[in-house]
């Protein structure tokens, strides 16, 4: 599945979370590729793990849940679904040299376009250059701020033993940068 040439993933339809994950994916592809070129499989594996777990699973999937609900806008839902599948596919491609059998199994179950590689072993290596048009540093900063606030709330809940089900009044004060 590709973002390039996709009607559903025209940049104007991407929300800040979409732009953020694509920006982070772009950076991850560059870093993992460099680690593989240096034969540093440990750092490559750690970078993939950090991205997949801490950014894709912990944040992007959480951001996506509201956009996937029954009452969500169908066009927005389609963009979100496409991005989820695209990013997961890229993670599998990055991870394939380290875990070939598991990644092939997961990839085999994923939705694919007609011209997609039938197996990861023959799929093209992710190219950060293809994602350059989707890089958005403003979105990256905005989502980093959201993650920081949510992290602070989670920390406070843990520190004081407050259940995640308990509503907390939260106020965020931001400096006027204008």
Where are these regions (language model features)?
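Acidic, turn-prone loop/beta-hairpin segments
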Residues: 6-33, 61-152, 166, 171-176
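Single conserved hydrophobic/aromatic residue that forms the stacking wall/gate
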Residues: 1-5
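Short helix-adjacent coil turns
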Residues: 36-43
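Aromatic-lined ligand-binding clefts that engage carbohydrates, nucleic acids, or primary amines
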Residues: 45, 49
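Glycine-rich, charged/polar anion/phosphate-binding loops
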Residues: 152-158
């Amino acid at each position: 599945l590709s973002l390039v040439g996709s009607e559903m993933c025209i940049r104007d339809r991407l929300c800040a979370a979409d732009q953020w994950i694509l920006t982070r994916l772009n950076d991850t592809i560059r870093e993992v590729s460099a680690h593989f070129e240096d034969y540093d499989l440990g750092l490559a594996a750690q970078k993939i793990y950090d991205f997949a777990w801490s950014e894709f699973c912990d944040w992007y999937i959480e951001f996506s849940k509201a956009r996937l609900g029954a009452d969500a806008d169908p066009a927005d839902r389609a963009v979100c679904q496409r991005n989820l599948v695209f990013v997961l596919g890229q993670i599998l491609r990055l991870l394939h040299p380290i875990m070939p059998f598991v990644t092939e199994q997961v990839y085999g179950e994923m939705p694919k376009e007609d011209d997609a590689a039938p197996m990861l072993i023959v799929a093209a290596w992710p190219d950060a250059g293809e994602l350059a048009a989707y890089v958005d540093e403003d979105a990256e900063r905005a989502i980093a701020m959201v993650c920081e606030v949510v992290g602070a709330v989670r920390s406070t809940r843990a520190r004081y033993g407050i259940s995640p089900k308990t509503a907390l009044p939260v106020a965020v004060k931001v400096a006027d940068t204008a």
